[in-house]
Amino acid sequence: MALKHYKNSDSTVFNDAKALFDLNKNILLKGPTGSGKTKLAETLSEVVDTPMHQVNCSVDLDTESLLGFKTIKTNAEGQQEIVFVDGPVIKAMKEGHILYIDEINMAKPETLPVLNGVLDYRRQITNPYTGEVIKAVPGFNVIAAINEGYVGTLPMNEALKNRFVVIHVDYIDGDILKNVIKEQSLLQGDKQIEQIIKFNEDLRTMSKQGQISEEAASIRALLDLCDLITVMPVERAIKRTIIDKLEDEREQQAIYNAVELNF
């Protein structure tokens, strides 16, 4: 199946990302959860025909998750030997591929300084497990993404942040959102799609006002909703895809109110 490309009514978002990539700049995609940051990175990877290695950050991320680890392997002579298995950072550097670091502000600040040399003009790292000095081959690029104001995120270290050029990625809307729904979900009826877009606009407004979490207004949740609407009533589809994910009763009630206004 062909990759469904990232779309945005603001063409500068993708065009600038492509320009920064061509200049070999580290790109930091900044925006609300579910706004399409990963889709943008995947689209860029396809457009430039360069594979992408992904790191999903969390508080449990450690150096081995980034660089790799040692393990015991049986060689052709039947003898056991210790070998190093390259992690996503070293693989991307050696192969001239894209390194995508998702939710980089979820990682503990003390984990990421190991990447400083990778992210500056040197484009190299000394593997702390083997002593090997790895110099990135041409084609290697770094894209990272952060969710704004998301639970569990930490402020980015200034030294790390200064190694990136930032592109803000906001939610899509209007005709672009309508086309994305038609291309990436099972829902095709124009009238229902218009209702869903209006409902999503209300959710985004409530999210910006702090009444509900960003995830409730995400494009990801919206596309799930559109699929479910084709097999069940819209009210139940909203309950399954959005409301039941929320723990706060006030957030749930706010969305129930939006449902009553829109459907």
From Swiss-Prot:
Keyword NAD belongs to the record: no
One Pfam family linked to the record: AAA_5
Record key words, sorted: ATP-binding, Nucleotide-binding
Gene Ontology terms, MF aspect: ATP binding; ATP hydrolysis activity
Residues binding ATP: G31, P32, T33, G34, S35, G36, K37, T38
PANTHER family the record matches: MAGNESIUM-CHELATASE SUBUNIT CHLD, MOXR FAMILY PROTEIN
Sequence similarity: Belongs to the CbbQ/NirQ/NorQ/GpvN family.
Protein name, as recorded: Uncharacterized protein SAUSA300_1302
